[in-house]
Amino acid sequence: MYILWLDAAEFENKGGWKLETQFVRAVGQSYLIACDIPGDPVNDAIAEFDVKENGRYRVFVRTKNWKYPEAPGRFNVIVDGKELPAVCGKMPTQSWYWEIAGDIELGCGKHTVSLHDLTGWLARCAAVIITDDMDFVPSPETERLQKQRRQIKGISDEIKNCGEWDFVVVGAGPGGVPAAIAAARHGLKTALITGRPTVGGNASREGTIGLDGAGSRHLGFHETGIANEIKRIREYKNCTWQEAMELLIANEENITVFCNELCIDADTVDSKISSATTINAITLEKSVFKGKMFADCSGDAWLGYYAGAAYRIGREAKWQYNEKFAPEDADTLTMSGCICAQPDPDKRKFRGYRAENTNNPVIFKAPDWAVKLPEGDELHRTPMGDAIDSPWWVENSNDFDDLWDDEFCRDQLVRIAVGYFDWVKNSWSGKEKCTNYKLTGLALHNSKRENRRLIGDYVLNQNDFDGRTDFDDGVTYCGWSIDLHHPKGLFSGKEGPFYSNQNVPLT
């Protein structure tokens, strides 16, 4: 009996497919996604494999129909140049599933398997299984799937011990990086852990969101502390926020960075965190980090959640803090993220989509699965700048769950971005400005806004901002407007994109 398991990350030649690691917690593994020029099929992803005996083999793929029923992301599997019969990615479900791509006669020796994109619209493949056991069926359940994978690949389920640390920081974004640097400068042996391939979080080249605060609203003012050090390096070096953080981290010998390590559990002793467990987003190897102190800078408060800390999601009712902008009744609404990208540090970053002026008329017809927006001025929006990407207000309504349904939310943002480009090209009253625009890229990283919030000894609320509250244990000055987007997102009509945009007083 022969069973070969190929992870998406193991494809040596990924062609035009990109490795997606944002959703390992939900999907159970990383996956390849076909994304380059929207609507143009990408180059094949190719992997080599060996079989030891001549015979008939079955090929499974783990895939997803990410928008049922239209099935935008369809692909074929090709073995040794022969196309297998199934068109993958179109089953009537939006869950991840295993599909038989086909059976094929193989001789002993080396072979190739290719993923052949058919649409150019985000086809997905997480794994390929090749077996001569016609009774074998891979499990659809994430936990059992990972167990099957370990057994087939001969991987131990032992958790790797990554040592003991003075300070463990989970999350390496605008919160985690300064926390780690401050600790390192005080002599603490610090582990800086991120589930992403780089540091930076929302300010990385994936996220593209800057560390802007009150300094961007008040002439002559700027943020203080380590955040300002990062900003000064960025301005002096003319580099990205991510590169500025990397330069600052490199100067601290007490910091060790662990990328692609996603926090999935925590242990406590007497209600104090003693260790954090992570899973590698690519290899799925588990590790444990023991420490004397921990900081949850994960953005979604995963460490605190696993440790059993109190938390809230959504908006508190007005009676709780008597905040001017609070609703009368509590709810679970959270602001949508935006999909963002900067594929190359020398190229401009963009939100939603990227369009380029071809200097010749270009026709664009939106796919059936793109979100259909109100015609013309009925959308009650005016594109910002030259409309070569989408504004910050191209977002989901606030009842979408970015925490537990994050892949679906990202995909909905893709549908909205394509629908918005269609509106700009074909419906907006100023559409003649975009006659020569061609859709050339889609952003895939969901730069999230607020989500789960851990409850500490003091809850900062709107009255602290309005009343200029000073705190004896303050460590820095920062700020932004009370920037609340409309709960209906892009679909707020004549009510506009803001629920509040009130400036915060300087102290």
Regions found by a protein language model. Name each.
Residues 164-166, 186-190, 253-256, 287, ...:
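Loop/turn elements at helix/coil->beta-strand transitions in domains of secreted/extracellular proteins
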Residues 176:
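N-terminal Rossmann-fold NAD(P) dinucleotide-binding loop
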Residues 182, 188-189, 194-269, 312, ...:
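Conserved N-terminal/central alpha/beta ligand/cofactor-binding core
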Residues 270-276:
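Short, hydrophobic/aromatic-rich segments at coil-to-beta transitions
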